[in-house]
């Protein structure tokens, strides 16, 4: 129990569910909102509730969207023959901001991790396979993180694509090993994307 009561204790616990937020950071945020910016706290709570109510996943690419078909999938100007596979929705944001890529996406919502019980079915590989079978895709661009799990996931997807005769490329290693796309600077990510290689 918090020294200041149950409400503050619940707030501190709730803030700690965010990535990278430990006890001290949660305490700083909570005290700031309660002592200095109550209006900001109300706005944050309202925006979070609205996002939780309205946001879903695009039925085609699985990015976060307010509609069943996101704006990227609905855009007829995008190249339907290229499909970029990423781990998380934030990776799509990073690529869109840093590159001139104009194809489509598929978001895995993670990576293969047998030790954690994350297999192909948990990542929507059946949906990806269906897209590979029906969407007339010429090239699959693998933009998973350059970690052991990301590489294993990329290899699995390359096998799916290559058995269907689809060219498979991997973003270049301008991104440091162990790096996560959302934290890479725009120039490095742009160079890595332009220098992708065949698998």
From Swiss-Prot:
GO terms for molecular function: DNA binding; zinc ion binding. It comes from the Bacteria. The keyword Metal-binding applies. It holds the Pfam family Toprim_4. GO terms for biological process: DNA recombination; DNA repair. InterPro entries: DNA_Rcmb_RecR (IPR000093), Rcmb_RecR (IPR023627), Rcmb_RecR_Znf (IPR015967), TOPRIM_dom (IPR006171), TOPRIM_RecR (IPR034137). A zinc finger (C4-type) spans 58-73. Residues 81-176 form the Toprim domain. Keywords: DNA damage, DNA recombination, DNA repair, Metal-binding, Zinc, Zinc-finger. Disulfide bonds: none annotated. PROSITE patterns: RECR (PS01300), TOPRIM (PS50880). May play a role in DNA repair. It seems to be involved in an RecBC-independent recombinational process of DNA repair. It may act with RecF and RecO. Belongs to the RecR family. This is Recombination protein RecR. It comes from Nitrosococcus oceani (strain ATCC 19707 / BCRC 17464 / JCM 30415 / NCIMB 11848 / C-107). The lineage of its organism: Bacteria, Pseudomonadati, Pseudomonadota, Gammaproteobacteria, Chromatiales. The gene is recR.
